[in-house]
């Protein structure tokens, strides 16, 4: 991406609250591979996706379906994921959604990955992720030092109420596809500039892969939280996937190694930016899939939690039925062998 950076403005945002109610189940899903700068033939909606090699997802897979957008959860049947070795697809979906996947498996992509470690291997120089609390005078001094180091007009500004505003840059490194509202004309990144925002109820959706070099600058408040940054990015790209499918990471280069850390929902990216300074090597932000395997059950609504309990009970009953059937079959074969043996 070239030219002047496009900015996303985040001002006064709604206070943190419980996640919204679960979306209605998808009636019909359309999936298209959107190639940047090229038109797509709408008739491809009827063509099954090619190249995928779906396998059962791992036991730690707790994520959202790339087709219908619903949460994938279970103890035994967690879902399917594309495991094609020569591709970087990772398309993940429910078992029930497999037949509806129309998005072709993406070929090998240079995503610019670098080896990352989550903890320092040098015990003499531990990585400190804690951030100190600054006084108002220290914040003012930090802002002056920050503005003196940058070579652009993306300054930080101190407000009268003690808060401050500034800019953060987020790089999107998404392996899996994202979903946008389906329309007569397939969406593009340029369409995001004209969109009003994410809809609350989307029953038809189109999936595509975002370019690997997508970068966005956001103008945020010091109290803007990581979760709000994710939601703003999704609105800008018209993405209707659940924000909990994604996570914001901080990336740092130290001693020739790259360190990644997942930000908590309530962490304040601009505060981290101020403490680290303007250097991208000292700190940069990356949006990735939230594939840590951890589930924050408190973030789900009551209807969603009750639905998960029903799924768990149904899966437990099915698993018990299969076990009983297996042992019953084995017992029957042993009894048949006993009856076939001659007496004495």
Curated annotation (Swiss-Prot):
Zn-finger region bounds: Phorbol-ester/DAG-type: 51-105
Biased composition annotated in UniProt, kind: Low complexity: 179-189
A GO BP annotation: regulation of cell cycle
Residues carrying N-acetylserine: 2
Region (MOAP1-binding) residue spans: 315-318
Residue numbers bearing the Phosphoserine modification: 2
Residue stretches making up the SARAH domain: 294-341
Expression (tissue specificity): Isoform A and isoform C are ubiquitously expressed in all tissues tested, however isoform A is absent in many corresponding cancer cell lines. Isoform B is mainly expressed in hematopoietic cells.
Keywords: Acetylation, Cell cycle, Cytoplasm, Cytoskeleton, Metal-binding, Methylation, Microtubule, Nucleus, Phosphoprotein, Tumor suppressor, Zinc, Zinc-finger
Keyword Zinc-finger: yes
Gene Ontology MF: a single term: zinc ion binding
Residues modified as Omega-N-methylarginine: 36
Residues spanning the membrane: none
Span of domain Ras-associating: 198-292
Pfam families: C1_1 (PF00130), Nore1-SARAH (PF16517), RA (PF00788)
SMART domains: C1, RA
Annotated spans, Mediates interaction with E4F1: 2-119
Gene Ontology terms: cellular component: centrosome; cytoplasm; microtubule; microtubule cytoskeleton; nucleus; spindle pole
Gene3D superfamilies hit by this protein: 1.20.5.110, 3.30.60.20, Phosphatidylinositol 3-kinase Catalytic Subunit, Chain A, domain 1
Protein task: Potential tumor suppressor. Required for death receptor-dependent apoptosis. Mediates activation of STK3/MST2 and STK4/MST1 during Fas-induced apoptosis by preventing their dephosphorylation. When associated with MOAP1, promotes BAX conformational change and translocation to mitochondrial membranes in response to TNF and TNFSF10 stimulation. Isoform A interacts with CDC20, an activator of the anaphase-promoting complex, APC, resulting in the inhibition of APC activity and mitotic progression.
Quaternary organization: Interacts with MAP1S. Interacts with XPA. Binds to the N-terminal of CDC20 during prometaphase. Binds to STK3/MST2 and STK4/MST1. Recruited to the TNFRSF1A and TNFRSF10A complexes in response to their respective cognate ligand, after internalization. Can self-associate. Part of a complex with MDM2, DAXX, RASSF1 and USP7. Interacts with ECM2.
Protein name, as recorded: Ras association domain-containing protein 1
Protein's organism: Homo sapiens
């Amino acid at each position: 991406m070239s030219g002047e950076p496009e900015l996303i403005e985040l001002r006064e945002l709604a206070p943190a609250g419980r996640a919204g109610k679960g979306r209605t189940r998808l009636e019909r899903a359309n999936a298209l591979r959107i190639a940047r700068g090229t038109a797509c033939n709408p008739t491809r909606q009827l063509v099954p996706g090619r190249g995928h090699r779906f396998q059962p997802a791992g036991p730690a897979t707790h994520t959202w379906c790339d087709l219908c957008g619903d949460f994938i959860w279970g103890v035994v049947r967690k879902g399917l994921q594309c495991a094609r070795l020569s591709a970087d697809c990772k398309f993940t979906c429910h078992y029930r959604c497999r037949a509806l996947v129309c998005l072709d498996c993406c070929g090998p992509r240079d995503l610019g990955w670098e080896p990352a470690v989550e903890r320092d291997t040098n015990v003499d120089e531990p990585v400190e992720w804690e951030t100190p609390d600054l006084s108002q005078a220290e914040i003012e001094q930090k802002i002056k030092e920050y503005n003196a180091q940058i070579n652009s007009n993306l300054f930080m500004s101190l407000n009268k109420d003690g808060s401050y505003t500034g800019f953060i840059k987020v790089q999107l490194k998404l392996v899996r596809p994202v979903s946008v509202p389906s329309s007569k004309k397939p969406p593009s990144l340029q369409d995001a500039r004209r969109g009003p925002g994410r809809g609350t109820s989307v029953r038809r959706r189109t999936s595509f892969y975002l370019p690997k070099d997508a970068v966005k600058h956001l103008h945020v408040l010091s109290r803007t939280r990581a979760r709000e940054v994710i939601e703003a990015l999704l609105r800008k790209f018209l993405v209707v996937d659940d924000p909990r499918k994604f996570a914001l990471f901080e990336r740092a280069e130290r001693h020739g190694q790259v360190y990644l850390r997942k930000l908590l929902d309530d962490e304040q990216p601009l505060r981290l930016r101020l403490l680290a300074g303007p250097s991208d090597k000292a700190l940069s932000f990356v949006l990735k899939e939230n594939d840590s395997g951890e589930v924050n059950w408190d973030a789900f609504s009551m209807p969603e939690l009750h639905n998960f309990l029903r799924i768990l009970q149904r899966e437990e009953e099915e698993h018990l039925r299969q076990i009983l059937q297996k042992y019953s079959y084995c017992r029957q074969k042993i009894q048949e062998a006993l009856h076939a043996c001659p007496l004495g």
